[in-house]
């Protein structure tokens, strides 16, 4: 039976927090979006939700270095994590951001999946691999979105997708890789299907036995 598709246009902003200790109660299901500062994360979120200003695009690092929570339905949250990889920020600030990302990915009980965005022309940088390792160690479902797919012709695009799929096999079979273009809408329907499935509550042992 196919999972009903969720309406991501209903997503609305809830709160921002500098770290895990300032987030709301750790219940329900969260799916987080993360990526380097130039990976097109804000544009992807806006395309998925069809809300142009949901994730404000900013070239100023300080404006986007908070954990931003949005609610889709009661108990179903979408999380916009701080972008990483800025070149023009002090090392102390970089380390602080990385610590906040690591803590959230490894300690947030309601976190079920990570959507990791990478520019299709420059995938799998060091910090991307670190994020994949943290998410894999936390047994999260992982969706790698290769953004700006419109920048490549179909042949090279398919080649990169296949290369990244092969490279991420080391992180287990919970990793999916898809091409994505906010400009052309490529991948939006597939992301909607995947996330709708991941937002479904898992059956508990009691529920399974009752069904039998």
From Swiss-Prot:
GO terms for molecular function: GTP binding; metal ion binding. Mg(2+) binds at residues 42, 64. Keywords: Cell cycle, Cell division, GTP-binding, Magnesium, Metal-binding, Nucleotide-binding, Septation. InterPro entries: G_ENGB_dom, GTP-bd, GTP-bd_ribosome_bio_YsxC, P-loop_NTPase. One of its GO terms (cellular component) is cytosol. GTP binds at residues 35-42, 62-66, 80-83, 147-150, 180-182. Gene3D superfamilies: P-loop containing nucleotide triphosphate hydrolases. Signal peptide: none annotated. Its cofactor is Mg(2+). Residues 27-201 form the EngB-type G domain. Belongs to the TRAFAC class TrmE-Era-EngA-EngB-Septin-like GTPase superfamily. EngB GTPase family. Necessary for normal cell division and for the maintenance of normal septation. This is Probable GTP-binding protein EngB.
